[in-house]
Amino acid sequence: IKSSAASDVYKRQGNIEVDKQRTEALLADPKENAEHVMLVDLARNDLSRNAHDVQVDFYKEVQYYSHVIHLVSRVSGEINTDSDPVKTYVDTFPAGTLSGAPKVRAMQLITDIEHHNRGAYGGCIGFIGLDGDLNQAITIRTFVSRGNVLYYQAGAGIVAKSNDERELQEVNNKLGALKKAIDLAEKLIN
């Protein structure tokens, strides 16, 4: 079983040298690093419920996407012989990147604070095979179409040292690719 912890979003600038500087700043940012440690710990705890020999395969690998820079770690383990894929799925969901820690209390706070249900956002899409294989991906940075209206959303990890303006900027950075897709679609229509 494998789980990826992706966090710590910095906006890409489209310039190799500037992106390199932003990557160095991201790797040196104490708040972003503390947040990432929390997410890796959550993934380790989640996998340990149904797996043994849980380990971190790679830690804080820099990954570049069209609009953002992420730190990504992968946690894996060997599924226990008595584990069942559905229970394993339930025990690892929702991902810590969307709940925070401690997970149960964080989910209670999200339910109390957020004004509406998250819908597909933060859920997952995937499959459970007849052979017991399970594969899922978190539905973030995704459009949902209802009644001829497109909906999309993003969030940011709030921790003790969070800065409101930086967290809002992180949300906007995450939405950059979706906004660009809308702009391109509008140009095609017009």
Where are these regions (language model features)?
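Extracellular interaction modules
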Residues: 1-6
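Extended alpha-helical targeting/anchoring segments
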Residues: 7-190
